Amino acid sequence: MIHAGTRPLRVLVTKIGLDGHDRGSRIVAAYLRDAGMEVIYTPPWQTIPGVVKLATEEDVDVIGISSLATDHLIVPKMMEALRAAGLGHVGVVVGGIVPEAEQSALAAAGVSRVFGPGAAREEIVECVTALGQKSRAERVDDYSEANP
Amino acid sequence: MAPSPSPIPLAQRLRAGDPRAVARAISLMEEGGSAAAALHAAILPATGRALTIGFTGPPGAGKSTLVDAFVAELRKSGRTVGVVAVDPSSPLSGGAVLGDRIRMGRHTDDPGVFIRSIASRGHLGGLSRSIHHVVDVLDAAGRDAIVIETVGAGQSEVEIVDVAAVRIVVNAPGLGDDVQAIKAGILEIASILVVNKADLPLAPRTVRQLKAMLSLRREGEADVPVLETIASEDRGVAELLAAVDACATLRPEDAAARRRTRIRRLVAEGAAGEMRRRILAWDDAAFLETLARAARGEIDIDTAARAAMEAQAGGVPLPVAVPQKADRRAG
Ligand code: B12
Ligand SMILES: Nc1nc2c(ncn2[C@@H]2O[C@H](COP(=O)(O)OP(=O)(O)OP(=O)(O)O)[C@@H](O)[C@H]2O)c(=O)[nH]1
Ligand SMILES: [Mg+2]
């Protein structure tokens, strides 16, 4: 038998759409790794179904979307797709350059937090940690759950 | 048995191939503990059908790129695929950036390919502690082929032998002193040797060096093909799949033996872990005295270890005792 222990939080750091700015997402991936998390990092230009498949297979606790020059409103569409795929428990944060008007739309769609340029490492780590722990606590334990 | 949530619904869902259940089961296996053990027991009868293929080799040889192309080839042959890509954890933070998947982008829309990134979590040998269980989950989920990419080869990577029926050692020209990069132990576990990046000028030299090394092998050892690939252009990959399939049909009897070795190793690892935990937490006065004597050099460490282990084990016979042996022990 394997030793029972705690599993590090698993976080998907990715970018959807045509936005190629990847400096922020690389830095954030390194922050989270150095804080002891397992980061699944992807290059930019992912699709919504692609992100859903990734998040499902990798069983992540949090998804971090970096969004600098896209139609930011792609994020609410992703949230909807996640819920439809049974991943409603996964926490979502966004970072990058998001106009204030759109920030409220993201919040309304269930995004926990939007980070802007210059966001501090400690703040990011603290937020993602809390969100990941909440996500684990809230997840319906699939292994006792009835067949849907 | 400790009261734990029944793993049976999860076992059923994963056997039906539900990706969310498969993903959750893998996490559970990584966590370990009684729920994992119960789930493993529940799915074990459904395992043993998948073809397991391991890719190992030095960092940057092109393993992930080759796996990506190889999986595409497997899909062309109509097989469903599970991929387990192992990356190292940082020894300092315990965290990891799991990057193999970056090179496996072409399968993002294909439900026939399930990819899972695993962190080594300090386990030596290029794999992770729970790798056997993870592979069993994908096997029970009905994946026809399971592809395992290990952490770039060190010297201790022979563990892949237990896990994969067919082992592919990937090399590339120009990775330092070519042949030095391929340690002898690694050569011995190879079912197939690949020289990837065959588009690079030094490739023929690497092929020659590998063939020369192979010629030094003992007589009677199975032939190891040396193939050239250009993973980034899908070249040589169909030939690689053909070689893999040939290798798998050549030695079908290996599967049962490998499985037994594997289970034996899992039992040994579990026992070692349990013993370690017990001894680290042991504060019995007689044991503390044994430690003190060892510290003074009055007894050697091996003797102290054996004494501790035997005292801990308490001479309790195994639950399923073979009658004759039990008699002998009693008398
Ligand atoms: C560098 C840069 C580029 C580089 C990108 C290089 C690269 N590989 O990343 C290049 C020159 C290629 C480029 C191109 C373009 N750019 Co540009 N670019 C910038 C610039 C100057 C800096 C971005 C940057 O790298 N910052 C450094 C990183 C570390 O900061 P960051 O990404 O903000 O990340 C921090 C936080 O936001 C947060 N964070 C970010 N992501 C995440 C994710 C998670 C999960 C979390 C928790 C936190 C988090 O944490 C980070 C650390 O604090 C910005 C202007 C600016 N001041 O931001 C414009 C900017 C982003 N670019 C812009 C534009 C318009 C473009 C182009 C469309 C220009 C054009 N017409 O061609 C192209 C598009 C290219 C493409 N395909 O996407 C606009 C976007 C406007 C908008 N939001 O609507 C900006 C804002 C400039 C402007 N004021 O107009 N750009
Ligand atoms: N020229 C050439 N480059 C290749 C080929 N295959 C892979 N590469 C490149 O080699 C680099 C490493 O490829 P990976 O697939 O990440 O190698 P890896 O062995 O998985 O690396 P690690 O997982 O980090 O050990 C990448 O830049 C690839 O694009 C090839 O056939 N020819
Ligand atoms: Mg790799």
UniProtKB/Swiss-Prot annotation, chain A:
InterPro entries: Acid_CoA_mut_C (IPR006159), Cobalamin-bd (IPR006158), Cobalamin-bd_sf (IPR036724)
One GO molecular-function entry: pivalyl-CoA mutase activity
Binding-site residues for adenosylcob(III)alamin, renumbered to this chain: 21
Xref: Pfam families: B12-binding
Catalytic activity entry: 3-methylbutanoyl-CoA = 2,2-dimethylpropanoyl-CoA
The protein's Enzyme Commission number: 5.4.99.-
Keywords: Cobalamin, Cobalt, Isomerase, Metal-binding, Plasmid
Residue ranges of every copy of the B12-binding domain listed in the record: 8-138
UniProt KW Metal-binding keyword: yes
Cofactor annotation: adenosylcob(III)alamin
Entry keyword Isomerase: yes
GO biological process: acyl-CoA metabolic process
Biotech use, per record: This enzyme and the derivative PCM-F, a variant in which the alpha and beta subunits are fused into a single polypeptide via a short 11-amino acid linker, have potential applications in bioremediation of pivalic acid found in sludge, in stereospecific synthesis of C5 carboxylic acids and alcohols, and in the production of potential commodity and specialty chemicals.
Annotated function: Together with Xaut_5043, catalyzes the reversible isomerization between pivalyl-CoA and isovaleryl-CoA, using radical chemistry. Does not exhibit isobutyryl-CoA mutase (ICM) activity.
Assembly and oligomerization: Monomer in the absence of the PCM large subunit. Weakly interacts with the PCM large subunit; an alpha(2)beta(2) stoichiometry seems to represent the active state of the enzyme.
Recorded family membership: Belongs to the acyl-CoA mutase small subunit family.
NCBIfam families associated with the record: acid_CoA_mut_C (TIGR00640)
Classification via PANTHER family: METHYLMALONYL-COA MUTASE, LARGE SUBUNIT (PTHR48101:SF1), METHYLMALONYL-COA MUTASE, MITOCHONDRIAL-RELATED (PTHR48101)
Name under which the protein is recorded: Pivalyl-CoA mutase small subunit
